[in-house]
Amino acid sequence: METTTKLAIGVSALCCLASAAFAGGPDIPMIDMNGFHIGLGFGYKSYTYDQVGTVTVTTNGGTVLSVLHPVSASITQFGPVGELGYTFASDWWIAGVKAQYQYDNVRSVHIMDAPLVGSNYSYRTRLGSHLTAMLLAGIKVNEANAVYLEAGYSTVWGKTTLFGPGPVAVSMKNRLNGGIAGIGWRHYFMNNVFLDLSYDYALYRSKSNSVTLSSATASAEGTAIGVSGTVQNPKRVAINGITATVNYLFNI
């Protein structure tokens, strides 16, 4: 009961703060939203991607078995964000440009069984930091708040490493490019400090690329058996999430 009461009090307080931000209270002097800004914050992102690996078994040069290992992964990541941009504002609208860089280190490991020979391949996929550049346009809700829409270009860096049955590995790096769009809200605490909160969805695509790792064994009858593992880079990655930064505004 005590926990429920505290939660209710907290929710009520947040509602009061939100109401005060958009209406009521004393008049707030007009804030100059024009200028260059730079800020730091955090982002909570959800990564979704598809990837395919293949294990092939051959004897005497002929394929005996080829097994596909498709993977659909969904991973969340919390990481630091840097932001900079420039805003133009009138009495009732805002427009501008914004760039964000988020450091992420999304990792996933998948096992690929090699039938008939009892050995395994595995591959590790890493999706690293991503960079976005967007145009934005919106309206002022009041003297200290504005809502806007944004859209632009984004890129994310990745790396896939394929491990064989022995202490051998091969890797490939790739960069995925795509578009990003979202909605945001800015609250100005004072003339030079504001909170920038946004939700965005980004879709990335990349050219198909792959790496292969092969090994050979011999059966009891002396027949040579070859085993190879192949993995493709993620060709399609979707990222959606929330970003919050605190920025300092230079009215220049």
UniProtKB/Swiss-Prot annotation:
What are its GO biological-process terms?
monoatomic ion transport
Q: What is the effect of changing residue 228 to L?
A: In strain: Kerns and Scurry
Q: Where in the cell is it found?
A: Cell outer membrane
Its biotech or industrial use comes down to: Might be used for vaccine production.
Q: Name one GO molecular function term.
A: porin activity
**Key words of the record:** Cell outer membrane, Ion transport, Membrane, Pharmaceutical, Porin, Signal, Transmembrane, Transmembrane beta strand, Transport
Signal peptide annotation? 1-23
Q: What is the effect of changing residue 17 to F?
A: In strain: Henzerling
- Effect of mutating residue 33 to L: In strain: Henzerling
Q: Which Pfam families match?
A: OMP_b-brl
Name the major location: membrane
Membrane topology value? Multi-pass membrane protein
Indicate the impact reported for residue 131 to F: In strain: Xinqiao
Name the reported effect of residue 78 to S.
Answer: In strain: Xinqiao
What result follows from mutating residue 172 to I? Answer: In strain: Xinqiao
The source's superkingdom equals Bacteria
Gene Ontology cellular component list: cell outer membrane; pore complex
Task: Show the InterPro entries listed in the entry.
Answer: OMP/PagP_b-brl, OMP_b-brl
- Function of the molecule: Able to form a pore in lipid bilayers.
- Description of how the protein assembles with itself and partners: May form trimers.
Specify the protein name: Outer membrane protein P1
What organism does the UniProt record list as the source?
A: Coxiella burnetii (strain RSA 493 / Nine Mile phase I)
